[in-house]
Amino acid sequence: MKNTLIDDIASLARDMGEVRLMEVCGGHTNTVMRYGLRDVLPKNIRLISGPGCPVCVTSQRDIDSMVELALSGVPVATYGDMINVPGTKMSLVDAQNLGADVRMVYSIDQIIDEKDRVFFAVGFETTTPMTAKLLSAGIKVFCAHKVMPPAMRALTQEMRLDGFIDPGHVSAIIGSDVWGRMDIPLPQVISGFKPDQLLHAIFILLQLIQNKEVRVVNDYSEIVFPNGNTIAQRMIKETMKPVDADWRGMGTIPLSGLAPIDPLLDARLIYADLFKDIVSVENPACRCGEIVRGLVEPKQCPLFGTVCTPEHPQGACMVSDSEGACAIAYKYGKSLAE
């Protein structure tokens, strides 16, 4: 990390009060904790981790629905981390241990010919094009995809924030121009994932805040273009439609999710009778819902590092060690303490 950049941030921050900046990308959260960026920032610059982990924000009911579907005898598949997320009664891996046909995949190509299998689709705009490919191939999908900009707008109505570090990979899909059209009343900087890139984004945000400028700066222009990935956007538009979506800890956010356009490929509709009586209950001691909103830090959860570890997660935030705030904090906090 460049000391001159750290010094420049300190110089700007000297004449400012408390500044609350939120990153909303699991990759950014990983970099922040791995390299201890909070420790090199002035004390009045607070860096808050937001809902950047798709596994973490997937609702309890969606997980319970997939467990119920698997236990009923329907073959299901999903990406690796999702099978370990605890549901009300069990996780998908628990259902697998009871004999359910649950397949963990690393690529959609592993199941693109399996017409009888339901894919549990989770992720932000970055992974949505792969689900679009499955739908085009006639694979049934239980769609829990989330769209990031509406969630960020919702956060500004709930808590005091001074600026956003926008997600780089999401921005590469949707394009930098989208952020300026989303009615988010805060300065935003699209950033890469290296420590110096994040520090530079913070420096630009402080300049914008100091100058009272509410605009979007693309500081990752080698990857993110104004119109984004138009091929991926077209694939999504041809197979999916915007819908209201439930986020863990944030409730229902209008038009923040996606659903298959074809009702014959929408597992929520196909198996609606199976899902209608599901009663989902979250662990009352788990604070994952507050953590994804940036209201508390992982170590403020009473379960963190005691009964809740990556080997035995009690909540979704402890599952993904690449994007989950609790799993990342446990991983690097533990390594720093050793």
Each PLM stretch: what is its role?
Residues 89, 152-154, 176-177, 201:
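Short, well-ordered secondary-structure micro-motifs
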Residues 34-35, 131-133, 177-178, 203:
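Short amphipathic alpha-helical segments
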Residues 142, 159-225:
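A conserved active-site cap/scaffold subdomain adjacent to cofactor or substrate pockets
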Residues 200-290:
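Internal helical hairpin/lid segments
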Residues 66-67, 94-96, 157-161, 207-208:
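Short, hinge-like loop/turn segments at secondary-structure boundaries
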Residues 114-121, 126-167, 173:
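Active-site histidine-anchored catalytic micro-motif
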